[in-house]
Regions:
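Membrane-embedded beta-strands that build the outer-membrane beta-barrel scaffold
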Residues: 58, 93, 105, 132-134, ...
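Short loop/turn motifs that connect adjacent beta-strands in outer-membrane beta-barrel proteins
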Residues: 19-32, 63-73, 98-105, 141
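Cleavable N-terminal export/targeting peptides
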Residues: 1-30
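Solvent-exposed loop/turn segments connecting transmembrane beta-strands
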Residues: 44-54, 69, 79-90, 99-101, ...
Length: 174
């Protein structure tokens, strides 16, 4: 698996950077704050449901508070709204895990305020977002990728249906 990742990194670096340069594999020393714009599917696993709808999201990722070569911890703040008026606003922590320079996987978790609008009732005004995203980082430090997450009230209420979201995002440095 490591060999496949290395070969893929060499191919992408030579394709997008024009040559196999050392900078392509350099550590992520200067990780910028990011603002991310995303759109996708709300309640993605229940496409026949009336509660399945589109959504948009805005997210800001702060500077790393724990910084190692291939692992970074940073705070995030985000807001989402779906096309039925449901709203989630919250924040938490993200864990950036680097696989060569251009590829990063981010795991995240954080609580937030939820309002159902005319959408699915998730059972409680506090919902926790647990997420995973896979992204390609361009030479200018912007990112493009997919994000998947689950919103759940973590059983603070007896009603805890949760919802899954799948988004395509584009993040730019601040």
């Amino acid at each position: 698996m490591r060999l496949l990742s290395f070969v893929t990194s060499i191919f992408l670096c030579s394709t997008f950077y024009g040559k196999q340069s050392e900078s392509c594999f350099a550590s992520q020393k200067n990780v910028p704050n990011l603002i991310s714009f995303a759109a996708g599917d709300y309640n993605v696993f229940h496409t026949a449901s009336k509660e399945n709808t589109g959504m948009v999201q805005l997210e800001v990722k702060g500077p790393p508070v724990f910084d190692r070569k291939y692992f970074k911890v940073r705070a995030f703040g985000a807001g989402l709204v779906n096309f039925q008026g449901s709203l989630w606003i919250g924040g938490g922590i993200n864990f950036d895990i680097w696989f060569g320079r251009p590829f990063v996987m981010t795991l995240g978790i954080g609580p937030g305020y939820f309002s159902k609008g005319k959408g699915k009732d998730l059972g409680y005004p506090m919902e926790v977002r647990s997420s995973v995203e896979f992204a390609y980082q361009t030479p200018k430090l912007s990112r493009v990728g997919l994000q998947f997450y689950h919103l759940s009230n973590a059983s603070f209420s007896s009603k805890n249906p949760g919802v899954e979201c799948l988004l395509l995002f584009y993040a730019i440095p601040l």
